[in-house]
Amino acid sequence: MRKPQAGTGEAARDPSLRPARTVLVGDQDEYTAAENKSPRGTLCPTGEQRIHAREDACIFSRLFSEK
C-alpha cells in the first residue's frame, strides 16, 4: 500500500486547513546562528545581558514586551 502524497488531500484544496507557519519579524541579521554570535552572550530587548541566551527566548520577549 502506498503512502498518500503530501498536498493531495483536503488541506491542499482549502488553505484554511493547513497548519500555521512561524514567521520571524525583524532584521534578518538579528536571527543569525548561535555559533556566529558573540561568545559573551546576546543582548535581549530588556537591555540586560544574558550569557549564552537562547535566540528563541529573546524573540519571545520581543513579541510580548510592553511598549
Swiss-Prot record:
Region (Disordered) location: 1-22
Source organism superkingdom: Eukaryota
Family, per entry: Belongs to the FAM27 family.
Name this protein carries in UniProt: Protein FAM27A/B/C
Organism: Homo sapiens (Human)
